[in-house]
């Protein structure tokens, strides 16, 4: 059995776990600090909050872009990213694995997630809002990759691809 849980990424001089939008999430702990004031916090199970709501709330409270990744059994990751100007967007890492999860409920990947190319375009804009200049092609490659072996590794590869780590 793999990892199930959330990674929450935002920039703040204060600990993310102490912000108004995260205080009510029990078990939220610091996973790592990235460059500048960027932080990754982790919740090892599904919190009682929607990821897009959390990403938007973090973006609004910090005034900076925010990103939430929900890891599903180390197979795939739902990415919810937001900024206060453009709202939220949803994509995934390890799309074949995600499609399998959705198919179990009779759903299709394209009904919920951006394509890897669309996700990469959104990620470039998101990264630009963080002050980083990144290229579409390497990000599209990350969004197309399958977990090998752990999807959470792809999540941190995405953060590096957006010049956060």
Where are these regions (language model features)?
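Generic alpha-helix signal with a bias toward terminal, lower-confidence helices
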Residues: 20-22, 70, 101
């Amino acid at each position: 059995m793999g990892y199930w849980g959330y990674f929450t990424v935002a920039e703040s001089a204060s600990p993310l776990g102490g912000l108004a939008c995260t205080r009510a999430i029990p078990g939220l702990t610091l996973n790592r600090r990235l460059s500048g004031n960027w932080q990754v916090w982790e919740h090892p199970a599904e919190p009682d909050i929607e990821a897009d709501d959390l990403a938007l709330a973090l973006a609004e409270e910090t005034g900076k872009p925010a990103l939430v990744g929900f890891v599903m059994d180390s197979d795939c990751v739902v990415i919810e990213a937001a900024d206060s100007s453009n709202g939220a967007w949803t994509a995934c890492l390890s799309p074949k694995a995600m499609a399998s999860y959705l198919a179990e409920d009779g759903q299709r990947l394209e009904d919920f997630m951006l394509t890897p190319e669309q996700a990469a375009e959104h990620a470039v804009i998101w990264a630009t809002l963080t002050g980083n200049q990144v290229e579409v092609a390497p990000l599209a490659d990350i969004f197309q990759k399958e977990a090998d072996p752990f999807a959470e590794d792809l999540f941190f590869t995405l953060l590096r691809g957006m010049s956060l780590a």
